[in-house]
Amino acid sequence: MRLVFLGPPGAGKGTQSTRLQQKFNIPQLSTGDMLRAAVKAGTPVGLKAKAIMDAGGLVPDEVVVGIIADRIDEPDAKEGFILDGFPRTVKQAEALADILIKKNMKLDAVIELKVDDKALLARIENRAQESLAKGETIRADDNPEAFKKRLESYHAQTAPVSAFYAGKGALKAVDGMAPIDDVSAAIEKALAF
C-alpha cells in the first residue's frame, strides 16, 4: 500500500499515519527525517542537502525528490509506504508521479484530512497547553502567529495538491474534525479495507 497524507498543519496527519504504519507494517516517510538520515549516511543526495542546509538554505525540490526516490527503494518500503509532509506543491506531486512511473509503482490513495481553520487553531493552542502542563517545551511553531503563517502557506502552496490528485481520481477526503478513532475508521473505509 502506497499512500500520501495531505491536510493542514494540526489536522492529525502524523497521528493517522502512525496508526496505519502500525496496522500494516509499512514505513511512514517524513521528508525531514529522510533528509537527516541521508545526511548522516553520507549519500550523494545527502551530501548535497548537507551543503545547502549548512549554508542556511532551503533544500530544493530536486534534492528532496532524490531522497524520496532513494528511500522508497529500501527493503522496508517494498510492500508500501506512507508519505507524510510530501508532496507540498504541485511540482513535487508531478515529480513523485514521475518517480513512481519509473519504478513501476503507483499510489493506492491520497488521503486528505479536512479540518476547519478555527478548529485547527484551537487544536494547536490545546497542544501547547498540554505541553506546558506536562512541563515540556512548547514547539516553536505552536504559537498562534507562527501557526497562522503555516496555515497561510498550506492554503497557498499545498492545498492545490488536493486538486491535482482529485483530477487523477486518487483523492479520498476524510472529515478530520471527528474523534481520532472515528477518523481512523473513516480512513479505513475510504481505503475499502
UniProtKB/Swiss-Prot annotation:
Could you tell me the superkingdom of the organism this chain comes from? Bacteria
What top-tier enzyme class does this entry carry?
transferase
Which keywords has UniProt assigned to this entry? ATP-binding, Cytoplasm, Kinase, Nucleotide biosynthesis, Nucleotide-binding, Transferase
Record region (LID): 126-142
**Where is the major localization of this protein?**
cytoplasm
Q: Does the keyword Kinase apply?
A: yes
- Give the UniProt subcellular location, in the record's own words: Cytoplasm
For the ligand (AMP), the binding residues are 31, 36, 57-59, 85-88, 92, 139, 150
Gene Ontology molecular function terms on file: adenylate kinase activity; ATP binding
Q: In which pathway does it act?
A: Purine metabolism; AMP biosynthesis via salvage pathway; AMP from ADP: step 1/1
Q: Name one GO cellular component term.
A: cytoplasm
Q: Identify the stretch(es) annotated as NMP.
A: 30-59
Q: Any idea of its EC number? A: 2.7.4.3
Indicate the quaternary assembly: Monomer.
Q: What is known of its domains?
A: Consists of three domains, a large central CORE domain and two small peripheral domains, NMPbind and LID, which undergo movements during catalysis. The LID domain closes over the site of phosphoryl transfer upon ATP binding. Assembling and dissambling the active center during each catalytic cycle provides an effective means to prevent ATP hydrolysis.
This protein is called Adenylate kinase
Q: Which organism is it from?
A: Methylocella silvestris (strain DSM 15510 / CIP 108128 / LMG 27833 / NCIMB 13906 / BL2)
Q: Which gene encodes it?
A: adk
